[in-house]
């Protein structure tokens, strides 16, 4: 089973993912899973080097170059992490996947859905998530959070508010137009423990997820 988590930078998803996995392991000690993320991947030096380039605030790329870097990193990640884990019947939890690409590059960078979908179809093939949790919180609130917590901003996080507004609106459009009904919208303004409980309770009742519980 392939589960992804999406949302703006500062939405709290990475913190929630880590707490969620702790709770799952506490309750289901033999749960077999892989935790990974994009851009980059789990211990994959090639895609991690691309990640460093993409997020380096000292480097500049055209939107198309950036999109090609993301796509290359994604294919490496699929080949070396996602597909092998799924072949071993493990659950894959992934912090960001191609929905981020659509939102950030398609909408944020104004490359459009046709262009980003073409690249995604080439890179991804049939490796589509079974379930995606979207952390819903406004760009204004995420900026406020990052400022209050003195978080270091990478190259994308340094973009102005209009960029992040486009990304947010892009996510909403992607969810609205999704034909696979795989999205679960999470209120990311709630406390971390409430979000963790919500996702945990959703998963343990999900018909595909329960097959992995021991």
Curated annotation (Swiss-Prot):
Signal peptide: none annotated. Pfam families: Thymidylate_kin (PF02223). ATP binds at residues 7-14. GO terms for cellular component: cytosol. It catalyses: dTMP + ATP = dTDP + ADP. The keyword Lipid metabolism does not apply. One of its GO terms (molecular function) is dTMP kinase activity. Keywords: ATP-binding, Kinase, Nucleotide biosynthesis, Nucleotide-binding, Transferase. It is an enzyme of class 2 (transferase). The keyword Cell wall biogenesis/degradation does not apply. GO terms for biological process: dTDP biosynthetic process; dTTP biosynthetic process; dUDP biosynthetic process. Its EC number is 2.7.4.9. It comes from the Bacteria. Phosphorylation of dTMP to form dTDP in both de novo and salvage pathways of dTTP synthesis. HAMAP family: Thymidylate_kinase. Belongs to the thymidylate kinase family. This is Thymidylate kinase. It comes from Mycoplasmopsis synoviae (strain 53) (Mycoplasma synoviae). The gene is tmk.
């Amino acid at each position: 089973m392939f589960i992804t988590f999406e949302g703006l930078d500062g939405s709290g998803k990475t913190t929630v993912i880590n707490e969620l996995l702790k709770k799952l392991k506490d309750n289901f000690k033999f749960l077999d899973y892989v935790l990974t993320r994009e851009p980059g991947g789990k211990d994959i030096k090639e895609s991690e080097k691309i990640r460093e380039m993409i997020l380096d605030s000292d480097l500049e790329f055209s939107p198309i170059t950036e999109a090609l870097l993301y796509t290359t990193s994604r294919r490496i990640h699929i080949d070396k992490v996602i597909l092998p884990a799924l072949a071993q019947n493990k659950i894959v939890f992934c912090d960001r996947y191609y929905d981020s690409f659509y939102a950030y590059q398609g909408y944020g960078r104004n490359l459009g859905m046709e262009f980003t979908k073409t690249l995604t179809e080439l890179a991804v093939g049939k490796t589509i998530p079974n379930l995606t949790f979207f952390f819903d919180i406004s760009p204004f609130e995420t900026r406020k959070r990052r400022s209050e917590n003195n978080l270091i901003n990478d190259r994308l996080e340094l973009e102005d508010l209009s960029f992040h507004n486009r990304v947010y609106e892009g996510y909403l459009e992607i969810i609205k137009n999704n034909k696979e009904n795989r999205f679960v919208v999470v209120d990311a303004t709630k406390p971390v423990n409430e979000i963790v409980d919500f996702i945990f309770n959703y998963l343990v009742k999900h018909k595909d997820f329960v097959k992995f519980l021991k």
